Amino acid sequence: MTGTIDEFKKLVDAEEFFQFFNMSYDLEVVNVHRLHILKKFSQYMHEIDENSPDLSQEEKLNQYSLALQKAYQVFIESTAYEQKLFKVFNDKPKNVVTLTEITSD
């Protein structure tokens, strides 16, 4: 990795992040889980920023690189449904009676 934090801040696409950190990736995995990988990566970056505010830019980029690898690995080993990163996975259906709620008299 030879980029700067300013270059990092200009990145948008998942592929750009992987290229910035010189990380190999399976395009099929990224195509299927793109938003989920980026969301998880964002969560990890937020944790790094909150827990280690005094890191140098180089140290921060190194931590971000590890965070991207970790986020990518999560979706190799599990599914988006299992991770439930987005609101749609956590919303409870309205006006639905589940089978476990039905009892016989």
UniProtKB/Swiss-Prot annotation:
GO terms for biological process: nitrogen fixation. InterPro entries: NifW (IPR004893). Keywords: Nitrogen fixation. Disulfide bonds: none annotated. Pfam families: NifW. Homotrimer; associates with NifD. HAMAP family: NifW. May protect the nitrogenase Fe-Mo protein from oxidative damage. Belongs to the NifW family. This is Nitrogenase-stabilizing/protective protein NifW. It comes from Nostoc punctiforme (strain ATCC 29133 / PCC 73102).
